[in-house]
């Protein structure tokens, strides 16, 4: 009986960690890439995409608010990320473990305002978009450092609100509203994308 209990504990302890978003996209769609759409020293907007008929289709639009100041042990990896590398993959390869304390969930209601986002996601018409926000913390030995606050806006072809909740569980502080915060964060990107479209059309 004791041996069986020990084996059960070993199996439980050896369960694989949750997939990174990049890993989940590749597993579901067969490919993965990241493209930085807009970035400065404070914030990065990026498309986490897979290829469909050779073209990138956004599965998650990620808005990353970087820690300020950036902790010294993270600066080298941070430069790679600012240059366009995947956040999760970069820190994982550098030996950091990743923790994602959840801040909250919400849904961006379907609206023509997000037309350019829908285009990136390959959607033909407006649709509700599941969003969630979390802190990205990095752990190595006795060190625990906060890197960023991240908001992820998911294509309904990838993750629905129900699926997001199943994957990430409940916020430790209880449900919170994130749609207003994410809407505000998206404003500069939407303006830039609209301007780019107008310039190309003109």
Q: Model-found features: residue ranges?
A:
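Composition-driven recognition of glycine/serine/threonine/acidic- and proline-rich low-complexity segments
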Residues: 14-202
């Amino acid at each position: 009986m004791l041996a069986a209990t020990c084996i059960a504990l070993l199996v439980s302890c050896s369960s694989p960690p949750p997939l990174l978003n990049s890993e989940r996209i590749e597993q579901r769609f067969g490919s993965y890439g990241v493209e930085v759409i807009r970035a400065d020293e404070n914030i990065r907007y990026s498309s986490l995409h897979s290829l469909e008929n050779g073209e990138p289709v956004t599965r998650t639009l990620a808005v990353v608010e970087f820690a300020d100041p950036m902790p010294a042990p993270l600066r080298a990896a941070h430069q790679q990320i600012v240059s366009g590398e995947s956040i999760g993959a970069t820190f994982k390869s550098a030996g950091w473990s990743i923790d994602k304390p959840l801040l909250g969930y919400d849904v961006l209601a379907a609206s023509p305002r997000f037309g350019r986002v829908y285009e990136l996601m390959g959607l033909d018409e407006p649709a509700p978009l599941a969003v969630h926000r979390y802190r990205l913390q990095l752990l190595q030995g006795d060190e625990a450092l906060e890197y960023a606050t991240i908001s992820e806006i998911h294509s309904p072809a990838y993750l629905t609100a129900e699926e997001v909740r199943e994957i990430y569980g409940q916020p430790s502080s209880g449900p919170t509203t994130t749609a207003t915060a994410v809407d505000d964060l998206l404003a500069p990107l939407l303006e830039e994308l609209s301007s780019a479209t107008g310039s190309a059309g003109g």
